[in-house]
Amino acid sequence: NQAGPTTQLSWLMPPGPAGQRSFALKKTRPAIKLEMMARRDAASGQFDLTDAGQPVLRYNYATIAPGDVVAKVDAANRIYAQARSDYIHPLFGLNGETLTQDWSVDHPHHRGIYCAWPEVDWRGQRGDLHALQHVFARPTGECKPTSGPVFAQIEAENVWLWENGESLVNERAIIRAYHA
């Protein structure tokens, strides 16, 4: 017998006289409708959460390069137009309106919703995960979407790298949205 995932089965004993009773276990399809969906977009590598088919948010897990945005950013702010990942954008309101912004021309390092430490000291140097200077969050490839009737979630692993080289922090992000 190989070790594997276990399942627990529970039931209430029906009323009746003591003695031997027979039960039949039947496998049926769940009657529960999966309202909340979390899935990876194959084209972009990002993860989308939806509620009854309506968009809730996009988790930008795969690294996004600035692309054409760099040309629009003034020379003083160009150093902040760096490739980034590990953030939410867009986040949608209950009426479908976009609540976040990305790639601002005057602050190109600002991005939707993200967690970042503004000053990271490493081997005598100072980096800034918020301003994308020397420290960058990068996906490890371990990202698990979960869908269900009550909530959808994304459990993602990222690593904070110094100059995209040495690993500083292993981050586990859990993003969960509940059915409206």
What does each model-identified segment do?
Residues M36-A43, E155-A180:
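Acidic, contiguous internal or C-terminal segments within carbohydrate-active enzymes
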